[in-house]
Amino acid sequence: MYYGFDMGGTKIELGVFDENLQRIWHKRVPTPREDYPQLLQILRDLTEEADTYCGVQGSVGIGIPGLPNADDGTVFTANVPSAMGQPLQADLSRLIQREVRIDNDANCFALSEAWDPEFRTYPTVLGLILGTGVGGGLIVNGSIVSGRNHITGEFGHFRLPVDALDILGADIPRVPCGCGHRGCIENYISGRGFEWMYSHFYQHTLPATDIIAHYAAGEPKAVAHVERFMDVLAVCLGNLLTMLGSPFGRGGWGVV
């Protein structure tokens, strides 16, 4: 059995897959954002619950919204502060008594799509995740291209392009990013960016679900906001496709 964890800034989801890669069980729980021991306990509890369900110990892999450090085994997870700088792989492996593999979540997503029978004929596949942050994975000839420091494909940390500034206004604040820089596109085209831009333009805070509900009802501010957001998203993604020349792109969405 294969246990695949999707660890995001908002939720952790475990999917259990059989030898035919069919999902047979899954469970979702909130992500503890500040408490590392609690995070480890949740991962351990989910693993043991899956073991009980399957009657065997499955292989464990975790997709994280960040980067594993190849030098010291720690992880860089700006959107999950509880795991930031922690030796997650070694600690969890010790707790559940088996090997644990960790990679960037967008790399995992892109690789799974690239190996789908429908897409195996494509030499290059670009996978993008829009959720709490923005992640990316680049697959060439069936293999992840991650680079020496695992930063290849971290498209969310590109800066806002000029065309996006034309849409948003040259005076749009360069939002501080968890990576330490300002103006990274993940702070504008992610779920939290979607909410932040609404509050910036209308001086009123609403959750994304309410904004979308207002948009569906034809409320003018919400309609203008969603259209502005989609224009910025199109500019950012268009630049990526131009740079990579990728014949196939796949998106994973969790903005609302």
UniProtKB/Swiss-Prot annotation:
Its EC number is 2.7.1.59. One of its GO terms (molecular function) is ATP binding. The keyword Amino-acid biosynthesis does not apply. The keyword Transferase applies. Pathway: Cell wall biogenesis; peptidoglycan recycling. ATP binds at residues 4-11, 133-140. Disulfide bonds: none annotated. Keywords: ATP-binding, Carbohydrate metabolism, Kinase, Metal-binding, Nucleotide-binding, Transferase, Zinc. Pfam families: ROK. GO terms for biological process: peptidoglycan turnover. It catalyses: N-acetyl-D-glucosamine + ATP = N-acetyl-D-glucosamine 6-phosphate + ADP + H(+). Zn(2+) binds at H157, C177, C179, C184. Might be inactive, since the sequence is shorter than in other family members, due to a probable natural frameshift in the C-terminus. Belongs to the ROK (NagC/XylR) family. NagK subfamily. Catalyzes the phosphorylation of N-acetyl-D-glucosamine (GlcNAc) derived from cell-wall degradation, yielding GlcNAc-6-P. PANTHER family: N-ACETYL-D-GLUCOSAMINE KINASE (PTHR18964:SF162), ROK (REPRESSOR, ORF, KINASE) FAMILY (PTHR18964). This is N-acetyl-D-glucosamine kinase. It comes from Yersinia pestis. The lineage of its organism: Bacteria, Pseudomonadati, Pseudomonadota, Gammaproteobacteria, Enterobacterales. The gene is nagK.
